[in-house]
């Protein structure tokens, strides 16, 4: 990998030059507590030391709402509507959000590529930035706190500038086109980088092993936590909309006022909505709020056997923005036995039966 240094005094000039490559988006402060990725007119408004944006960068690639095709019911045909996307740059993406995009890639690009997602992914330039964790961050436990790839450039803060890692041919071109703004990395810079990474690791609130989380979630399907926390849940879906990896959508046909023409659109859906598991005939795969609440925890941490990865990147958004003050990481730690001295007796006695039946998909009195 190639490493260069961008001196602090050249930062804004480099950011300004990025606009020559397309629209520039970066984190800006939108209120006392909140940040969001917005199009940048004035590069001096960019926030380099933000904790997290409300919406993850997935919104640029997987649109909250988009038209798929148009139709005319008088004709046996339809016309696909694929947006013409101009190149764009997203600056200031944290490592956990980069991992989030990589997970979305496994869903929308592997096997059967989604053309709507793909066209945006091909046009987007990703520039990551280092960060210090706050009390909500647990990306270190998900091993998503340091990005090895998935970016064109990655900026690591130094006392007098940035150590820049170059991750793609596009990243090389960005540096080479502006080579006069960059310098070689010195021994002093390497020491500063090492010191920053050491302090960053020490700043995390939690330092523990979550390696058996998936299995404990499968075993603890009736843990009392599910009832307690589901009762608090407002089923608003904000944990889904702010999540970097939530990818469910619903599809609807919209007929225009002429009653003949229309279009099909897809829009983000939430597994916390009752309608999410509702199918023809009125059957609902997850009829209760508890079912839906528990399903999200399983989706993020247990439904990953095929890909061998967690669908949670530890960004902390679902906890930080939850209006009911439900702690996602706190609930997982309860399942892991890290926030309670011992399991309730009724739970520990039934674990062997429930665990075997659940994991093996076997049901019956003899299990």
Swiss-Prot record:
SUPFAM superfamilies: 4Fe-4S ferredoxins. It is found in: Cytoplasm. Signal peptide: none annotated. Gene3D superfamilies: Alpha-helical ferredoxin (1.10.1060.10). GO terms for cellular component: cytoplasm. Transmembrane segments: none annotated. Optimum pH is 8.4 for sulfur reductase activity at 80 degrees Celsius. Its EC number is 1.12.98.4. Residues 222-254, 303-332 form the 4Fe-4S ferredoxin-type domain. [4Fe-4S] cluster 1 binds at residues 233, 236, 239, 243. This is Sulfhydrogenase 1 subunit beta. It comes from Pyrococcus furiosus (strain ATCC 43587 / DSM 3638 / JCM 8422 / Vc1).
């Amino acid at each position: 990998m190639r490493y260069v240094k961008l001196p602090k005094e050249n930062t804004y000039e480099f950011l300004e030059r990025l606009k020559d490559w397309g629209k520039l988006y970066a984190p800006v402060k939108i209120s006392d507590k909140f940040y969001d990725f917005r199009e940048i007119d004035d590069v001096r408004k960019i926030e380099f030391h933000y904790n997290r944006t409300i919406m993850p960068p997935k919104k640029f690639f997987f649109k909250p709402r988009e038209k798929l095709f148009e139709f005319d019911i008088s004709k046996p045909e339809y016309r696909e509507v694929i947006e013409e996307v101009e190149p764009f740059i997203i600056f200031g993406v944290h490592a956990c959000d980069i991992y989030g995009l990589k997970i979305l890639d496994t869903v929308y690009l592997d096997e059967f590529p989604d053309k709507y997602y793909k066209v945006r992914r091909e046009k987007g330039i990703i520039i990551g930035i280092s960060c210090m964790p706050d009390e909500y961050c647990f990306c270190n436990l998900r091993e998503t706190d340091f990005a090895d790839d998935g970016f064109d450039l990655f900026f690591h803060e130094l006392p007098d500038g940035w150590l820049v890692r170059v991750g793609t041919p596009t990243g090389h071109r960005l540096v080479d086109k502006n080579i006069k703004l960059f310098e070689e990395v010195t021994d002093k810079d390497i020491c500063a980088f090492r010191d920053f990474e050491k302090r960053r690791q020490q700043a995390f609130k939690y330092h523990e092993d979550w390696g058996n989380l998936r299995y404990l979630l499968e075993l603890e399907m009736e843990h009392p936590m599910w009832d307690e926390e589901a009762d608090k849940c407002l089923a608003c879906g904000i944990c889904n909309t702010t999540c970097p990896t939530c990818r469910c959508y619903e599809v609807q046909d919209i007929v225009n006022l002429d009653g003949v023409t229309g279009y099909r659109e897809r829009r983000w859906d939430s597994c916390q909505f009752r309608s999410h598991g509702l199918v023809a005939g009125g059957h609902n795969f997850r009829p209760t709020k508890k079912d839906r609440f528990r399903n999200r925890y399983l989706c993020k941490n247990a439904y990953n056997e095929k890909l061998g990865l967690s669908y949670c990147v530890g960004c902390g958004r679902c906890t930080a923005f939850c209006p009911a003050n439900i702690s996602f990481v706190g609930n997982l730690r309860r399942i892991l036995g890290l926030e309670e001295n011992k399991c309730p007796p009724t739970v520990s006695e039934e674990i062997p039966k429930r665990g075997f039946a659940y994991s093996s998909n076997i049901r019956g009195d003899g299990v």
